[in-house]
């Protein structure tokens, strides 16, 4: 069973995402921020990471940069609802840093599941 790490500071969103992903046969780990997510990944790597981009502390952009530097083959889906610049600017930057897929919040479940399946093939 593939393992997925969700990094997002929004507890409700993380819980909802976890339930949806688990219902589709995946094992899920959670972290409330980039710093915690990186620590968790270093201790027990997962097959895929789904990370929000706009978070307090170590944001998703910094998280992707650090993980890709140390683990170049890591598979990452970046998600964003926007912020001051708008979601497309953050998602474009995440893609440039190595995120294989980018999705805009609110997440469309079929689109997310398709991205997960493609990356875990």
Language model region names:
Residues 8, 52:
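Active-site residues of response regulator receiver
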Residues 39, 61-73:
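Short amphipathic alpha-helix used as the core "switch/output" element in two-component signaling
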Residues 62, 83-103, 110, 114:
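Alpha4 helix (beta4-alpha4-beta5 surface) of REC/receiver domains from two-component response regulators
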Residues 79-81:
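Hydrophobic/aromatic residues positioned on beta-strands within the core alpha/beta folds
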């Amino acid at each position: 069973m593939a393992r997925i790490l969700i990094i997002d500071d929004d507890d409700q969103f993380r819980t909802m995402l976890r339930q949806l992903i688990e219902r589709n046969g995946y094992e899920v780990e959670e972290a409330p921020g980039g710093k915690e997510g990186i620590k968790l990944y270093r201790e027990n790597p997962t097959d895929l990471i789904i990370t929000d981009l706009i978070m307090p502390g170590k944001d998703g952009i910094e998280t992707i940069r650090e993980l890709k530097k140390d683990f170049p083959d890591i598979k990452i889906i970046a998600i964003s609802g926007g912020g001051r610049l708008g979601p497309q600017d953050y998602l474009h930057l995440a893609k440039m840093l190595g995120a294989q897929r980018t999705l805009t919040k609110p997440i469309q479940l079929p689109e997310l599941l398709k991205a997960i399946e493609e990356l875990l093939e």
